[in-house]
Amino acid sequence: MKKIVESTTFPRTKQSITEDLKALGLKKGMTVLVHSSLSSIGWVNGGAVAVIQALIDVVTEEGTIVMPSQSVELSDPKEWGNPPVPEEWWDIIRESMPAYNSNYTPTTRGMGQIVELFRSYPEVKRSNHPNYSFVAWGKHKNKILNQHPLEFGLGEQSPLGKLYIRESYVLLLGADFDSSTCFHLAEYRIPYQKIINRGAPIIVEGKRVWKEYKELEFREELFQEVGQAFEAEHNMKVGKVGSANCRLFSLTEAVDFAEKWFINNDSKNIKK
């Protein structure tokens, strides 16, 4: 916190963040997928609360604010690498891990303070996926979040697929392209995919069960390169919110570009 204070030229407030968001191009009525880093904004009076209030004030109830609220810890221990756990623990972990609950399962720590607070806000809804949930507030939250499928949880029937057809935007609020969840949707559209089995604890008919499901093997390590190529070829809003470098761009255009980029540039070429 000391470093954040020392690097901040003046206090960031809800009002100053609101003005910066408007200057960036965020408007009333927009549907926007937000990826955020609170610390990058500088010292904020009110912290994550001020940022969330600013987003709500700009977009208003006529728009919709969406954030990824992933909880990747609810996964098969055989996949864990940071740190790995002994194989003799695996069955115990699968049998005893608490099931996903949209009300109290926390977001993965790396998702940031803003979304972790946002999910607790009144009128914010969270989708029902143990790993790849989204939270949303505003006019279209139910249409975007309802019926989130367990299998292929970032695909066409997921909240990402619904955002794609809604002329939505992506706001990188101090985050970089490697956080751009929308690029996952493009991964489902390319002709080479590796399908893997995953598992998580969920509630089925009132009972906790360990459920296996199919998912893609994702290529997040390519997202920064994809985003930089997209930025080089497309106009997007670029500016500052506080100290944070920010970008605002069309989700649909980004997904379409990423699909073509993966086909033309991904040398891995994994076949089904």
Curated annotation (Swiss-Prot):
| Biological processes, Gene Ontology terms | response to antibiotic
Main EC class the enzyme belongs to: transferase
Q: Kindly give the InterPro entries that the UniProt entry links to this protein.
A: Amioglycoside_AcTrfase (IPR003679), Antibiotic_NAT-like (IPR028345)
Q: What keywords are annotated for this sequence in UniProt?
A: Acyltransferase, Antibiotic resistance, Transferase
Keyword Plastid (UniProt): no
| Domain of life, source organism | Bacteria
Cystine pairs annotated here are none
Q: One GO molecular function term? A: N-acetyltransferase activity
Q: Where is the signal peptide?
A: none
Which amino acids does the record list as binding CoA? 38-44, 113
Q: Pfam families of this UniProt entry?
A: Antibiotic_NAT (PF02522)
Family, according to the entry, reads as follows: Belongs to the antibiotic N-acetyltransferase family.
The function of this protein is: May contribute to antibiotic resistance.
Q: What is this protein called?
A: SPbeta prophage-derived aminoglycoside N(3')-acetyltransferase-like protein YokD
Gene name as annotated: yokD
